[in-house]
Each structure stands twice: as C-alpha cells, then as structure tokens.
Amino acid sequence: MNKIVFVCLGNICRSPMAEFVMKELDQEKYLHIESRATSSWEHGNSVHQGTQKILRKYAISFDSSKGSQQISQADFEFFDLVVGMDESNVEDLLQISAGRYDDKIKLFRPGGVPDPWYTGDFEETYKLVTAGCRDWLQWIKDRQ
C-alpha cells in the first residue's frame, strides 16, 4: 500500500497541497504520491497561487510546473489509495469508478477539508492538510 493519490475538485488547491506536504513528511521516500481532480475544469492549470504561497511559507518543496490532471480509470487501477479531500469528492470518485474500486476510495479526514478556492483561507487548509497527512502516513505505516 505505497501508492496514494489525493483528489479534489480542480487539482489546483487542496490535493496538490496534500501531495507536496505528504512528500515532505515521507522522509524515507517509501510512498509514491500524486494528486488529481474529479473534474476537467482546471485541466492543465498550475497550482493555485494561494497554495504555492502557503507551501513557500512553510518551506514545503513543490513542483511549480505541475498542471491539473483529471483522475482516470488507469489511476484507479494503479493507486492503492484514492483519497478524496471532502465528501463531495468521495461521492464523485465513487461515481467515476462505477463501483469497481470502492475499497480504495477514502475520505481524507472526517468532515473533509474546506476548499480554499471558496473560503480563501489557505492557512486553515494547510493546517488541516498537514494534520491529515500525518495521520495518513501513520495509518499506512501501521499496516505495513
């Protein structure tokens, strides 16, 4: 269980933040970590400036050339865990996967992570994402 993909609506705020925070926390480089979108609305767009700013503030390395990418059926096959950032993302993932990968689809944290695209609160998003990534990393290690 070492391949994880974080998924949000557009793949420009929450899921790339989770991707880069988790990569930073995974000091042993044990995990293969990526992020995707449930929609194609932001396809190819770079990580949101608010996300980039907060990652810089906390000295989290990130790929500034990363572009938004919609999740595919091949992704459901490849990844061991498909983690939706909120309940709506999980519902979309369950629908997109048509019931074939329900066991891989998980909610990032109880209550989800509010979308800073709408809230404007990238600081709160970062705190929730960091705490959630720590929990996921421990959860994964406990199952190895």
Please provide the spans of the model-predicted regions.
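Phosphate-binding/catalytic loops
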Residues: 81, 87-144
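Conserved active-site segments centered on acidic
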Residues: 1-77, 134, 138-144
